[in-house]
Amino acid sequence: MKINMLVIGGSAGSLDVLMDVLPNLRKDIHFPIVIILHRKKDSESLLADLLSSRSPLPVNEIEDKQPILPGVIYLAPPDYHVLIEKNNTFSLDVSEKVNFSRPSIDVTFESAADAYPNAIAGVLLSGANADGTEGLKYIKEQNGLVIVQQPGTADVAYMPQQAINEIEVDAILNKEEIASYINKLV
């Protein structure tokens, strides 16, 4: 399967996983990577700098109407839903929270699957609610690739376990296996 977009979603406990995954990504990844993390509304934007310090790829916090470029990691800003448009740009949205979250992983997974049918991969990491499960179902319906962190390696197993319970996932990976799996998608 050719991947043109990878979206990673997570909540409680997922930042540590990303800090392990990012340094091990290939520098020649040809698709954009979008990261949706549940963050407090007033959280500082230092997270992009922190992730950038660990990544071989550039990391940018998403801005409204920003073009989506290959080989770049994009981070959702706090308190905005991130929509991926069919014209290869982002839209930021402040509509109601979904699964008590803004940004919502489901919102981004679903819009990414619409924009990149047959060429989307979704990765769901550690977290404390069911956000991401419906979006992964939709990715699967659009013939995308569905990857979930092994709940036993998650700080908070609820989110990945919900996905496993509801969806036929393509891969269940220990956190140490995620980067090499992504690298094989290149």
What role is predicted for each listed range?
Residues 1-186:
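Conserved acid/base catalytic micro-environments in cytosolic active-site loops
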